[in-house]
Every structure is written in C-alpha cells, then in structure tokens.
From Swiss-Prot:
Compartment(s) of residence: Golgi apparatus membrane
Pfam families, alphabetized: COG3_C, COG3_N
Organism: Arabidopsis thaliana (Mouse-ear cress)
Protein name (Swiss-Prot/TrEMBL): Conserved oligomeric Golgi complex subunit 3
Keywords noted in UniProt: Golgi apparatus, Membrane, Protein transport, Transport
Length: 784
C-alpha cells in the first residue's frame, strides 16, 4: 500500500488531468443519471468487485507426498514460466515459503501498476504536450486574428478614405458645375448687351424674343440672390437692358398700330367714306378685317408680353400696349359711332333712341372685343383693358341721352326707359353672361341711375301736385249722383281689369292717380326708393280722400261723406296689398333741446364752458340726440278706415234705435241713482215709483217709442242699405259693415224687451205689441 501511495503521489501535475476532471464534472452536472441508470452501475460494480487473477499469474500445484507436504508454484511473471517447487517439511519452511510467495505476488502486482502508471504518465505527458501545442496554436490563431482585425480596420479605413475622397471629388465637381451655372447668369451680361446694342437688332428679329427671355431669367436669378457679390451692379445693368428692350417693343407696337390704322383709313377713304360699314359685321368690315391683317405681326410679341404679365415691368408695358391699341382703334371708330348715334337722336324718340343706341353700342363693343381678343387673348376677360376704347364710345350715347332725360316729365315714358334699360339691355347681358358687353355695363347703369333719379323726382312732384295738392271740382264731389249715373258692374277687388276701366270714373281722382302711379313705379324703382314713395303716396292719398269726405259732408249728407271715405279707403287698402313692401318709413332728426338747460346753467355760473372733466361740460353735451320716428301709412290707413266705419255704424244705429237707446239710458240712470243711496228724499220718492209710472215710461210712451223705432227701421234703414249698395258693390263688404248695425238694433230691442218683461204686465206688453227678436233678425236679414 505504501508503494501504491508512493506511486500515486509521484504522478505529475497535469493540465490535462484537471481539464479532464473539470470536463467530467461538467459532464456529470450537465447530464445527471436517472435512478435506473445508477442502479445498473451499482450492479456492475458488485459484479466486478472480485476480479479473477490474470492469465499470466502463477498457477500453483500442491502435491501431498506420502511422507510430507509438497507445494509447486508456477510463476509466469513477465512471461517467464519458471516453477517454484519446494518441499515444506515444517512450519518454519511454510512461513518462509509463504513470505516469499507473498513478496513475489506483491512484486508482481506492483509491477503491473507501475507499468500502468508509467503508461498513464506517458499518456498524460502526451496530452499535456498536445494541450500545450493547442494552446500555442490558439495563441497563434489569436495573434493572427488580431493581425487580421488590424488589417481589416486599416482596409476599412482605407476604403472609407477612398469613399470620402470620391464624395469630396463629386461635391467639388457639383460645386464647380453649380458655380459655373450661376456664373453663367452674370456672364450673360456681355452677350445680351452686345446683342441688344447691335444695329441689326430689332423686335422683328428672330433672336429678339429669346434674348428677352434670357434677360428676364438673369434678372429673376439676381433678384432671388441679392447676397452675391456685385449683384446690385449687375441687376442695375440688366434692368437698363430690359428697359431698352421694352422701349423697343413699345416703339415697335406703336409703329405697327399706326401703320395698320393708316392702311385702314386709306382703305376706308377708298370706299367713299361709307359710314355704315362699321355695322355690317366683323369679318366683312374693312375697319376690322384690314386692321387685323395689317397688325397681325404684333401677335407673337403681344403673346410673349402677356405670358410674362406676372412681373410688374410687363404689367406696365402690357397696360401701355392696351392704351396704344385703344387709342388707335378709337381714332378709327369714334367718328362713325358718333355720327350713327347722332343720326338716331335726330330721327327717333327718346325710348326708340335709347333702344337703338344701346343695341348699336352693344354691336360695336362685341366686334371690338373680338378684335381685341385676337391680339390680347389672355387679357380679353379684363373689363378694364378695353375701357379706354369703350368708355368714350358709350359716352357719346350718354351725352345725347342725359339732356333729354333731364327735361323729360312724362312718368310713363320714364318707366318705359327703365324697362328698356333694365330688361332689354342689362337683363339681356346678364342672361347671356356676355363678356364683350361688360365694358358697356357701367355706362348703361349710369344711364339707368339717371333715369331712376329723374323718375323718382317726377314721382314726388306728381304726388305733391296731383295728389296732395289736388283741388277737386264740383263734378269730383258730386256724390252720390256720380255713382248713380255709372253702371254698377264690379267690386272693389276687380278693379285692375281693362274691361272694368269705366269704374275708375267713379273714383276720386287722387285715388286713381295714386294707384296708377304706384303700379308703374313698382317694377321700375329699387325697393327702398319705392317704399318711401309708396308710403308718401298712400299717406297723402288718404289725407286727400279725408278732405274730400269732409267737403261731401258739407255738400250732401254725413252718411254720403262717410260711405265715400269707406269706399275709397277700402279700394286703397285692397289695391296696395299686392305690393310686397312695408309701408313704413323711419325718420331721423337731430334734437338739441337738451342743450338749453345746460346753457342756462352756464349763464348762471353753475357750470363751466371748458370743464372737460365733468359730464356736464358743453363739450360732452354738444352732440345732438338722434330721434327716430316711424310712420306706417298702411297702419294709419287701417286706423282711419276703422274709425270711419265705427262712426258710420254708430250714426246708423242712432238714426234707427235712438228712442230705445234713450229709454234704456234713462232707466239705467234711475237704477244707478237708487242704488247709490242719495240723500235727496224728494228725488228718491219720485224715482222710487215703479218704472211704468214714470213720465217717460208709461205704457203709452213705450207704445209710441216702439212704433217710432219700427217706422225708422222701415223708412230709414232701407234707404241706408240702398246707399250702402250704391257705394259698396261688394256684397261681403256690405255684410261685414251691416253686421254690427244689426247687432246694435237687436241688442237695443233685447234690452227693452227685458225691461218690459220685468216692469210691465202681460196685458201692457200685449198692448205695446213689440216685435219678437227672432222676427226682427229675420226682417233685418231680408233687407240685405
């Protein structure tokens, strides 16, 4: 055992062993055995616990002789098969033999283990050498990897540097190209200058427009980059060249336009100066066809200018071209237009002149717009472009119409002019959405405004003279004879039909004039203007009718005056109903009355004139107050009509049942006096008597009262209804007006009947013989 321990302790320390052990431990931990596997290992360990001797061990053969112990041992140690044979005689020899045998066996076993240890040591050494070589190889690989990484890093750095250099090269090339392209704009100055100042350069040259375009590009670029060195100097020089080029264009256009105008005038004179050629059509007229052909070379230049109209320089030159064009066109057509309008004024009346003149100007404007569109297609929708041409032409018509309008006093003719301008002329333009005629619209609207102003003035004068200040004649106030002599045909609501024109003869003239005037003005004037005129007309017409009613009362009867007023107010109310306006006007006026008290305080020394800090200072109270008052002519008309109807109803009621009303009033007074508890005993004794014993209420008096009322119903009410029918042709109107009269009559009879039943006996009631309420209502209904 000592030898074995010594052998094991003599094993060298090896990295292979530790690494193998660590690997085995890791393996054991990483791959634990199951219980079944562990049981199998235990079984195997028990099975191999007692190993048999190796085949090369010594085989012993023990022979027992007859006279002693014989032992034969065969040793095969290290391949030697020698035999140890000994004859054991005594114990001592046996012990000696056994000791030798034990030593031989131990020696043999130790030799085997030594050989195994030696072999294991060699293997361990070999493994250590291999591990050492592997470590050295790994170190070499690590060093090689580090060197590779270094080479890779250097290579990547080199590649990055190359890429950076390529990018810098590309940027420098792009910068150089950009710098070259930017410098080209500055370098163009010399090229453009030499071309523009060349004696052979003119607008008709094929290189002129490309040079102008390049010049504009240079100016735009320098304007967008003012930070460049000497940019202001170059910009100034480029602008000078641009001004020169635009001046050349202006001169060229003016020369071509004048040449074209001269050719047209020469051709026009060659035709004998026919003044009517301007109205014969666009394509056939020498003024348009020749001018278009003569000036056709301007079209490319004008199109270039219009395409650059976003720049202010070209806006100015384009406006100048428009002006030059309009001047030349005006010089050609103004004489013809003026002559034609003058011919219209000499031959035609004002409405026909307005219609013909507007139609002629519309035709001329249409042709001029077509020609203008040929040269300036992009500017054709701008109304102001042709204004220098259209305004003078339309002024010729305006100058001829205005003096005639100022002196025109006929409202019908002025209304006709409004219709012509608003419907036939301006309305026709709006319907067609005609751009060529848009330039004529301001002048037409100006003429229409003058006509409206004149019409408004004449309408106010007419209202003042013919309605408000109307002086009626005896024939105008001859009512009811005027109604009795006319056919009773229509009602108040059917007065606008032509077949009922005779009914106007029964009207009071201011009413007919008011309605006629308003019906004419309604479609002609603006709503605000018409509202003011309508309110004024209705107000003064109502006052005029009221004045006439008072005069009729003096000439005829009160009832005639009332019915006259009711009739005409009803007609006026019904006839103004279709006008979709408010007959109210708000009047504003300044009120300085509040300053009086403040001035008094200043004069008394109680306030200061220049005390700016106080609210009572004159400066603070100097501003006037604005007072607003609203006048509604329609409401005033309704109020007057209602008052007149109530007066008529009460007058008829009193005329028929006045005795009954007086009787009821006296009875009521007696009852009130008795209920008030007066102190006059003498009077109380008189009033305390029964009603039928009163002097005014005896049965005979009541009989007389009833007969008097019944006679009034028969004799007075029927003529009143006949007169109502004469004044008021509409049955529904008469029914509405008679209904409260009937109600009042029935109410008076009802009150008297109640008193009779309460105060008189049945015999007395029979003697009085008062008509029943039902019979009375039937009788009154039959009157209608």
């Amino acid at each position: 055992m000592a030898t074995k321990a010594a052998s094991s302790s003599s094993l060298p320390k090896s990295g292979a062993i530790s690494k193998g052990y660590n690997f085995a431990s890791t393996w054991e931990q990483s791959a634990p055995l199951t219980e079944q596997q562990q049981a199998a290992i235990v079984s195997l360990s028990h099975a191999v616990a007692e190993r048999p001797f190796p085949a090369n061990l010594v085989h012993e053969h023990v022979h027992r002789p007859e006279n002693g112990l014989s032992v034969s041992v065969e040793d095969t140690h290290l391949g030697d098969s020698g035999a140890i044979e000994a004859v054991l005689v005594n114990t001592n020899q046996f012990y000696k033999w056994f000791t030798d045998l034990e030593s031989a066996m131990k020696s043999e076993t130790e030799e085997k283990y030594r050989h195994y240890v030696s072999t294991l040591t060699e293997r361990i050494q070999t493994c250590d050498n291999i591990l050492h070589q592997v470590d050295e190889t790994l170190d070499l690989f690590n060093e090689l990897q580090l060197q590779h990484q270094g080479v890779t890093t250097k290579t990547k750095t080199l590649h990055d540097a190359c890429d950076r250099l390529l990018m810098e090269k590309q940027k420098l090339m792009e910068f150089a190209e950009a710098l070259r392209s930017k410098l080209n704009y500055f370098d163009e100055l010399e090229n453009v200058s030499s071309n523009f100042y060349s004696p052979n350069m003119n607008v008709s040259n094929s290189n002129f427009l490309p040079l102008l375009k390049r010049l504009d590009e240079c100016i735009s670029y320098i304007e967008d980059n003012p930070q460049y060195a000497e940019s202001s100097v170059y910009l100034l020089k480029f602008r000078q060249l641009q001004s020169r080029a635009l001046g050349m264009i202006r001169t060229y256009i003016l020369a071509v336009l004048k040449t074209a105008a001269s050719q047209v005038q020469a051709a026009f004179r060659g035709t004998g100066g026919n003044k009517t050629s301007v109205s014969e059509g666009v394509e056939a007229s020498v003024i348009y066809v020749r001018f278009k052909a003569a000036a056709n070379e301007l079209k490319p230049v004008l199109e270039e200018i219009e395409s650059r109209s976003a720049r202010k320089e070209y806006v100015q030159i384009l406006a100048e071209c428009h002006r030059l064009y309009c001047e030349q066109r005006l010089s050609l057509v103004k004489g013809i237009v003026h002559q034609r309008v003058s011919d219209f004024a000499k031959k035609e009346a004002l409405p026909s002149l307005t219609r013909s003149g507007c139609a002629y100007l519309m035709q001329v404007c249409h042709m001029e717009h077509q020609l203008f569109t040929h040269f300036f297609p992009a500017s054709s929708e701008e109304v102001s472009s042709l204004a220098p041409l259209v305004d003078p032409l339309s002024t010729y018509l305006y100058d001829i119409l205005r003096p005639k309008l100022i002196h025109e006093a006929n409202i019908d003719l002025l209304c006709e002019l409004v219709h012509i301008l608003k419907v036939e002329v301006l309305g026709d333009q709006s319907a067609r959405q005609s751009e060529p005629l848009a330039g004529l619209r301001p002048t037409l609207q100006r003429i229409l405004a003058d006509v409206n102003e004149r019409l408004t003035f004449r309408a106010r004068t007419y209202i003042r003279d013919e309605i408000a200040n109307y002086t009626p004649s005896d024939e105008d106030l001859d009512y009811p004879a005027k109604l009795e002599g006319s056919p009773n045909t229509t009602s108040e609501t059917d007065l606008r039909d032509d077949e009922n024109a005779d009914v106007f003869k029964t009207w009071y003239p201011p009413l007919e004039k008011t309605l006629s005037c308003l019906s004419k003005l309604y479609r002609c004037l603006e709503q605000a203007v018409f509202t003011g005129l309508a309110q004024e007309a209705v107000e003064v017409c109502s006052l005029s009718i009221q004045k006439a009613s008072k005069l009729i009362i003096k000439r005829s009867t009160t009832m005639d005056g009332q019915l006259f007023l009711i009739k005409h107010l009803l007609i006026l109310r019904e006839q103004i109903a279709p006008f979709d306006i408010e007959f109210s006007v708000t009047h504003k006026e300044l009120d300085f009355s509040h300053l009086l008290e403040h001035l008094r305080r200043i004069l008394r020394g109680q306030a200061s004139l220049f005390d700016w800090s106080r609210s009572t200072s004159l400066a603070r109270t100097l501003s006037p107050r604005v007072l607003e008052s609203q006048i509604d002519a329609k409401k005033e008309l309704e109020k007057c009509l209602k008052t007149t109807c109530e007066e008529f109803i009460m007058s008829v009621t009193k005329l028929v049942v006045d005795p009954m009303l007086s009787f009821v009033t006296k009875v009521t007074a007696i009852k009130v006096a008795l209920s008030s508890g007066t102190q006059n005993h003498k009077v109380d004794s008189v009033m305390a008597k029964p009603l039928k014993e009163q002097a005014f209420a005896t049965p005979d008096k009541v009989v007389e009262l009833v007969q008097k009322v019944y006679a009034a119903i028969q004799q007075e009410l029927l003529p009143i209804l006949a007169k109502m029918k004469l004044y008021l042709q509409n049955p529904s109107t008469r029914t509405i007006l008679f209904k409260p009269i009937k109600t009042n009559i029935v109410e008076a009879h009802t009150q008297v009947e109640s008193l009779l039943k309460a105060e008189y006996s049945a015999e007395e009631q029979a003697n009085i013989n008062m008509i029943s309420i039902q019979d009375l209502q039937t009788q009154l209904d039959n009157f209608l």
